[in-house]
Amino acid sequence: MNLWIDGRQVEAVPGERLLDAVRRLGLDHPELSRRPLAARIAGETFTLNYVPQREEQEDPAAMRRAMEASGGRITLLRYADSRGRQVYTRTVQFVLFLAIRQLYPGAVAKMNFTVGQTLNVTVEKEPAFTPGDVPALKERVAQLVEMDIPLLRKRITTQEAMAAFAAGGQVDQARLLSWRKTPYFDVYTYGDYMDYFYGEMAPSTGYLSVWDLVSDGGTGVQFCFPDSGNPDRVCQYRELPNFSAVFAESERWCHLMGCSTVADLNDLVQQGRLSELIRVNEALHERSFSQIADQILQREAKAVLLAGPSSSGKTTSANRLAVQLRVRGKQPVLISLDDYYRDRDTIAPGPDGKLDLEHINTIDTDLFRQHLSALLQGQRVQLPRFDFLTGRRTDTGKTLELDGDAIIIVEGLHGLNPVLLPKDVEKHLIFRMYVSALLPLNLDNHNRIPT
């Protein structure tokens, strides 16, 4: 059987792993930036521990079909590839949770949110986990990496997996598997520890060559991943207290509502309590906008600039905020940054020949600054409107002038960009906010759902 690994031909040896073939070709490297972490075969991700040439009855059908479909063509995945980073992350999870289990056998560790290129993991134990525990945990992780433990996946029945997870104190994973219809489940083990992270991992723990572990200042740690620009060095942890506080508050509410994992959500649905969960969340959402409206009035702001990624709910949030401001006797006026797009035929295409409509240069920032400055000074402006069918901006004839109770709400992708603000504007007149759809719900304590 011939294989083409990254375009180089090699003959598969019966019983030999992909990793061995990679090494025979001289494609393995000590530097993380060049080191293969996994392989892509016919669009699927495979571990480098996979054996292409083996007895047919031992070869899982999906893997065999992928090899046949690819014609033996294999692409290696490195850290620069998004799938390669996912493989690295799963390997990190296994090693970190194994280290926590070994140091604190009765502890409950939970994977939470990411801050930049770092991952937050909290540890619930008695006595409470503190920053003073971080050096010992870091040392244990380093030991597990140094041991270069092979990470081999094995298949067991779903019932066996449920029993093993429950016996090991991982009740959340056992509960999630109770909803699984497939009679088997794939796991990774080391000693009496068993886990799974819904995808392939690196061949061994020694592949975690670039990392750091720092305290989050409370009952957890921030795992620092390789720098995305240079994977051969660890990223710098930058504290974002407001960002972290929002995630922590969301997770606290999930806990209070008894809905921290997918198994919790399934139970609520089964108990007929889903509508109650939705109502409570809607009330919480309204309370958040009410508190924001109070902050706007306390600051005596006259313009709210609301930003967020595509489909994050910017328009919905702007309307909800407007309602709360009306309740407080104000007259909110909604303006969309989309109406300040430049005419499409005046926008230069990017290097790929396509228009990047998410770039700030597609917005007529000069006109927006003029209008915002004039409105804040009590002057009247004529509002534009962008016609997405024609790709051109038109004059609507609609004018706007703010009275004493008026507050502008501007929503758009670039709402936080300082280039939108007039140079002479007083800072207290501008209130900026960012909205995004957070999902603090985990599959289980060790597997988050990224957003």
Tell me the role of every PLM-derived stretch:
Residues 1-93, 98, 104-115, 126, ...:
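Ubiquitin-like/PB1-type beta-grasp interaction modules and other compact soluble beta-rich domains
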Residues 304-306:
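Hydrophobic anchor at the beta1->P-loop junction of P-loop NTPases
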Residues 314:
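Conserved lysine of the Walker
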Residues 317-321:
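Hydrophobic positions on the alpha1 helix immediately C-terminal to the Walker A/P-loop
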Residues 323-333:
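Post-Walker A helix-loop "phosphate-sensing" segment adjacent to the P-loop in P-loop NTPases
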Residues 333, 342, 346-391:
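Conserved nucleotide-sensing/catalytic segment adjacent to the nucleotide-binding pocket
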Residues 410-451:
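ATP-dependent NMP and nucleoside kinases share a basic, alpha-helical "lid"
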